[in-house]
Protein backbone atom coordinates (compact mmCIF):
# COMPACT_ATOMS: atom_id res chain seq x y z
CA UNK A 1 0.00 0.00 0.00
CA UNK A 2 1.28 3.46 -0.87
CA UNK A 3 -0.49 5.32 1.94
CA UNK A 4 1.42 8.54 2.70
CA UNK A 5 0.60 9.89 6.18
CA UNK A 6 2.45 13.12 5.45
CA UNK A 7 -0.15 14.07 2.84
CA UNK A 8 -3.26 12.59 4.42
CA UNK A 9 -6.56 14.33 3.67
CA UNK A 10 -10.05 13.08 2.86
CA UNK A 11 -10.12 15.22 -0.28
CA UNK A 12 -7.06 13.78 -2.02
CA UNK A 13 -7.19 11.35 -4.93
CA UNK A 14 -4.70 9.06 -3.17
CA UNK A 15 -6.85 8.82 -0.04
CA UNK A 16 -9.93 7.99 -2.12
CA UNK A 17 -8.15 5.23 -4.04
CA UNK A 18 -6.69 3.65 -0.91
CA UNK A 19 -9.45 4.45 1.58
CA UNK A 20 -11.04 1.01 1.84
CA UNK A 21 -7.75 -0.73 2.58
CA UNK A 22 -6.59 1.89 5.05
CA UNK A 23 -9.84 2.21 7.01
CA UNK A 24 -9.98 -1.51 7.71
CA UNK A 25 -6.54 -1.28 9.31
CA UNK A 26 -7.45 1.84 11.27
CA UNK A 27 -10.98 1.19 12.53
CA UNK A 28 -11.70 -1.80 14.77
CA UNK A 29 -14.51 -4.08 13.57
CA UNK A 30 -15.10 -1.85 10.54
CA UNK A 31 -16.66 -4.61 8.41
CA UNK A 32 -18.72 -5.82 11.36
CA UNK A 33 -20.00 -2.28 11.99
CA UNK A 34 -21.12 -2.04 8.36
CA UNK A 35 -22.79 -5.44 8.63
CA UNK A 36 -24.74 -4.45 11.75
CA UNK A 37 -25.74 -1.08 10.26
CA UNK A 38 -27.17 -2.91 7.25
CA UNK A 39 -29.04 -5.36 9.50
CA UNK A 40 -30.49 -2.51 11.58
CA UNK A 41 -31.53 -0.87 8.33
CA UNK A 42 -33.79 -3.82 7.66
CA UNK A 43 -35.94 -2.71 10.60
CA UNK A 44 -36.34 0.87 9.37
CA UNK A 45 -35.87 1.32 5.61
CA UNK A 46 -39.29 1.70 3.98
CA UNK A 47 -40.46 1.64 0.38
CA UNK A 48 -40.49 5.00 -1.43
CA UNK A 49 -38.38 6.77 1.19
CA UNK A 50 -34.86 8.16 1.23
CA UNK A 51 -31.87 6.51 2.90
CA UNK A 52 -28.93 8.83 3.51
CA UNK A 53 -25.30 8.13 4.37
CA UNK A 54 -23.44 11.17 5.73
CA UNK A 55 -19.81 11.08 4.65
CA UNK A 56 -20.42 8.23 2.24
CA UNK A 57 -16.74 8.03 1.10
CA UNK A 58 -16.43 5.21 -1.47
CA UNK A 59 -20.11 4.28 -1.15
CA UNK A 60 -19.67 0.76 0.21
CA UNK A 61 -22.34 1.08 2.90
CA UNK A 62 -24.96 2.44 0.51
CA UNK A 63 -24.22 -0.25 -2.06
CA UNK A 64 -24.40 -2.92 0.61
CA UNK A 65 -27.77 -1.71 1.91
CA UNK A 66 -29.20 -1.46 -1.60
CA UNK A 67 -28.06 -4.99 -2.47
CA UNK A 68 -29.18 -6.63 0.77
CA UNK A 69 -32.45 -4.85 1.57
CA UNK A 70 -33.91 -5.05 -1.96
CA UNK A 71 -36.38 -2.27 -1.25
CA UNK A 72 -37.61 0.44 -3.57
CA UNK A 73 -35.88 3.26 -1.73
CA UNK A 74 -33.44 5.98 -2.78
CA UNK A 75 -29.93 5.48 -1.39
CA UNK A 76 -28.21 8.86 -1.20
CA UNK A 77 -24.62 9.54 -0.18
CA UNK A 78 -23.39 12.97 0.89
CA UNK A 79 -19.67 13.71 0.75
CA UNK A 80 -17.62 16.81 -0.02
CA UNK A 81 -14.69 14.87 -1.53
CA UNK A 82 -14.91 14.84 -5.32
CA UNK A 83 -12.45 11.95 -5.53
CA UNK A 84 -14.39 9.82 -3.01
CA UNK A 85 -17.58 10.48 -4.96
CA UNK A 86 -15.94 9.45 -8.23
CA UNK A 87 -14.88 6.12 -6.73
CA UNK A 88 -18.36 5.62 -5.28
CA UNK A 89 -20.14 6.27 -8.58
CA UNK A 90 -17.68 4.21 -10.62
CA UNK A 91 -18.50 1.20 -8.46
CA UNK A 92 -22.24 1.84 -8.13
CA UNK A 93 -24.24 -1.01 -9.63
CA UNK A 94 -27.76 0.25 -8.99
CA UNK A 95 -29.91 3.04 -10.42
CA UNK A 96 -31.27 3.90 -6.98
CA UNK A 97 -27.86 5.04 -5.65
CA UNK A 98 -27.03 8.74 -5.86
CA UNK A 99 -23.99 10.61 -4.55
CA UNK A 100 -24.19 14.33 -3.77
CA UNK A 101 -21.09 16.54 -3.46
CA UNK A 102 -21.98 18.91 -0.65
CA UNK A 103 -21.05 19.92 2.88
CA UNK A 104 -23.51 18.06 5.09
CA UNK A 105 -24.24 21.00 7.41
CA UNK A 106 -25.91 22.75 4.44
CA UNK A 107 -27.90 19.71 3.34
CA UNK A 108 -31.67 19.33 3.77
CA UNK A 109 -32.85 15.78 4.47
CA UNK A 110 -36.37 14.86 3.33
CA UNK A 111 -38.66 11.83 3.57
CA UNK A 112 -35.94 9.83 5.34
CA UNK A 113 -36.57 6.46 6.96
CA UNK A 114 -32.90 5.78 7.75
CA UNK A 115 -29.85 8.05 8.04
CA UNK A 116 -26.33 6.87 8.85
CA UNK A 117 -23.12 8.66 9.79
CA UNK A 118 -20.10 6.41 10.13
CA UNK A 119 -17.08 8.21 11.63
CA UNK A 120 -17.95 11.49 9.94
CA UNK A 121 -19.44 14.02 12.37
CA UNK A 122 -16.30 13.85 14.52
CA UNK A 123 -14.54 15.85 11.79
CA UNK A 124 -17.12 18.67 11.82
CA UNK A 125 -16.91 21.59 14.25
CA UNK A 126 -19.36 21.44 17.14
CA UNK A 127 -21.68 24.21 15.93
CA UNK A 128 -22.07 22.64 12.48
CA UNK A 129 -22.41 19.20 14.07
CA UNK A 130 -25.35 20.39 16.15
CA UNK A 131 -26.91 21.96 13.05
CA UNK A 132 -26.43 18.73 11.09
CA UNK A 133 -28.04 16.54 13.74
CA UNK A 134 -30.95 18.96 14.01
CA UNK A 135 -31.40 18.72 10.23
CA UNK A 136 -31.24 14.92 10.50
CA UNK A 137 -33.99 14.92 13.12
CA UNK A 138 -36.20 17.24 11.07
CA UNK A 139 -35.68 15.22 7.88
CA UNK A 140 -36.50 11.84 9.42
CA UNK A 141 -40.01 10.47 9.13
CA UNK A 142 -41.65 9.53 12.41
CA UNK A 143 -40.29 6.13 13.42
CA UNK A 144 -37.16 6.64 11.31
CA UNK A 145 -33.70 5.99 12.72
CA UNK A 146 -30.36 7.77 12.82
CA UNK A 147 -27.23 5.63 13.20
CA UNK A 148 -24.17 7.45 14.53
CA UNK A 149 -20.75 5.79 14.78
CA UNK A 150 -18.00 7.92 16.32
CA UNK A 151 -14.58 7.77 17.86
CA UNK A 152 -15.04 9.15 21.37
CA UNK A 153 -13.02 10.65 24.18
CA UNK A 154 -12.82 8.91 27.54
CA UNK A 155 -15.08 10.23 30.28
CA UNK A 156 -12.05 11.03 32.45
CA UNK A 157 -8.34 11.58 31.82
CA UNK A 158 -7.06 8.15 32.86
CA UNK A 159 -9.62 6.21 30.81
CA UNK A 160 -8.95 8.47 27.82
CA UNK A 161 -5.21 7.78 27.94
CA UNK A 162 -5.72 4.03 28.35
CA UNK A 163 -8.12 3.87 25.41
CA UNK A 164 -5.76 5.86 23.18
CA UNK A 165 -2.88 3.51 23.93
CA UNK A 166 -5.03 0.44 23.26
CA UNK A 167 -6.12 1.97 19.96
CA UNK A 168 -2.53 2.73 18.90
CA UNK A 169 -1.59 -0.88 19.67
CA UNK A 170 -4.53 -2.06 17.54
CA UNK A 171 -3.29 -0.12 14.50
CA UNK A 172 0.25 -1.43 14.90
CA UNK A 173 -1.02 -5.00 15.20
CA UNK A 174 -3.04 -4.47 12.01
CA UNK A 175 0.04 -3.70 9.95
CA UNK A 176 0.41 0.07 10.13
CA UNK A 177 3.93 1.22 10.97
CA UNK A 178 4.74 3.31 14.02
CA UNK A 179 5.58 6.23 11.72
CA UNK A 180 2.22 5.95 9.93
CA UNK A 181 0.34 5.93 13.24
CA UNK A 182 2.20 8.97 14.58
CA UNK A 183 2.03 11.00 11.37
CA UNK A 184 -1.68 10.24 10.92
CA UNK A 185 -2.30 11.47 14.48
CA UNK A 186 -0.35 14.63 13.71
CA UNK A 187 -2.19 15.23 10.44
CA UNK A 188 -5.64 15.27 12.07
CA UNK A 189 -4.76 17.54 14.98
CA UNK A 190 -7.36 20.26 15.09
CA UNK A 191 -9.41 18.37 12.48
CA UNK A 192 -10.67 15.42 14.52
CA UNK A 193 -12.92 16.77 17.28
CA UNK A 194 -14.32 13.79 19.20
CA UNK A 195 -16.73 14.09 22.11
CA UNK A 196 -17.45 11.68 24.94
CA UNK A 197 -20.28 9.16 24.63
CA UNK A 198 -22.36 11.23 27.08
CA UNK A 199 -21.77 14.41 25.08
CA UNK A 200 -22.85 12.70 21.84
CA UNK A 201 -26.06 11.51 23.46
CA UNK A 202 -26.76 14.97 24.87
CA UNK A 203 -26.32 16.44 21.39
CA UNK A 204 -28.88 13.98 20.03
CA UNK A 205 -31.29 14.88 22.82
CA UNK A 206 -30.80 18.58 22.11
CA UNK A 207 -31.79 17.95 18.48
CA UNK A 208 -35.07 16.38 19.63
CA UNK A 209 -34.33 12.65 19.89
CA UNK A 210 -35.73 10.88 22.96
CA UNK A 211 -35.19 7.19 22.15
CA UNK A 212 -31.40 6.75 22.18
CA UNK A 213 -29.31 3.65 22.81
CA UNK A 214 -25.79 2.28 22.30
CA UNK A 215 -25.55 -0.77 20.03
CA UNK A 216 -21.75 -0.99 19.68
CA UNK A 217 -18.81 -0.19 21.92
CA UNK A 218 -15.16 -1.10 21.50
CA UNK A 219 -12.62 0.89 23.46
CA UNK A 220 -12.97 4.46 22.09
CA UNK A 221 -15.41 3.66 19.26
CA UNK A 222 -19.19 3.66 19.73
CA UNK A 223 -22.32 3.05 17.70
CA UNK A 224 -25.50 4.88 18.71
CA UNK A 225 -29.07 4.53 17.47
CA UNK A 226 -31.60 7.35 17.81
CA UNK A 227 -35.22 6.87 16.71
CA UNK A 228 -37.62 9.73 16.00
From Swiss-Prot:
CDD domains assigned to the protein according to its UniProt record, in alphabetical order: AdoMet_MTases (cd02440)
Sorted UniProt keywords: S-adenosyl-L-methionine, Transferase
GO biological process: tRNA wobble uridine modification
Alphabetized Pfam families for the sequence: Methyltransf_25
GO MF term list: carboxyl- or carbamoyltransferase activity; S-adenosyl-L-methionine binding
Protein residues bound to S-adenosyl-L-methionine: 30, 55-57, 79-80, 103-104
Record flagged with keyword Transferase: yes
Disulfide bonds: none
Classification via SUPFAM superfamilies: S-adenosyl-L-methionine-dependent methyltransferases
Family statement: Belongs to the class I-like SAM-binding methyltransferase superfamily. Cx-SAM synthase family.
Protein name, UniProt field: Carboxy-S-adenosyl-L-methionine synthase
Source organism of this protein record: Staphylococcus epidermidis (strain ATCC 35984 / DSM 28319 / BCRC 17069 / CCUG 31568 / BM 3577 / RP62A)
Name of the gene: cmoA
